[in-house]
Amino acid sequence: MKAAELRKLTAEELKTKLVEQQQELFNLRFRHATAQLENTSSMGDARRTIARIQTILKEKE
């Protein structure tokens, strides 16, 4: 998601998205470890999305 889209969400929605993204990153790491992940750049995308969400949550505080 883009930062502009994330800024439109409430803090509760952002926290929900954060948990979802963290779970997705966890799953991607498992798939990478078992050599089932074809697109390894998706791990970086997930990390960047998590960072964006955390940054926007801090801005809203």
Curated annotation (Swiss-Prot):
Superkingdom of source: Bacteria
Keyword set includes Ribosomal protein: yes
InterPro entries: Ribosomal_protein_uL29 (IPR050063), Ribosomal_uL29 (IPR001854), Ribosomal_uL29_CS (IPR018254), Ribosomal_uL29_sf (IPR036049)
GO CC, alphabetical: cytosolic large ribosomal subunit
GO biological process, one term: translation
GO molecular function terms attached to this record: structural constituent of ribosome
Keywords for this protein: Ribonucleoprotein, Ribosomal protein
Signal peptide limits: none
Pfam families found in the cross-reference section: Ribosomal_L29 (PF00831)
HAMAP family hit by this protein: Ribosomal_uL29
PANTHER family: 60S RIBOSOMAL PROTEIN L35/50S RIBOSOMAL PROTEIN L29, LARGE RIBOSOMAL SUBUNIT PROTEIN UL29C
Protein family (similarity comment): Belongs to the universal ribosomal protein uL29 family.
Protein name: Large ribosomal subunit protein uL29
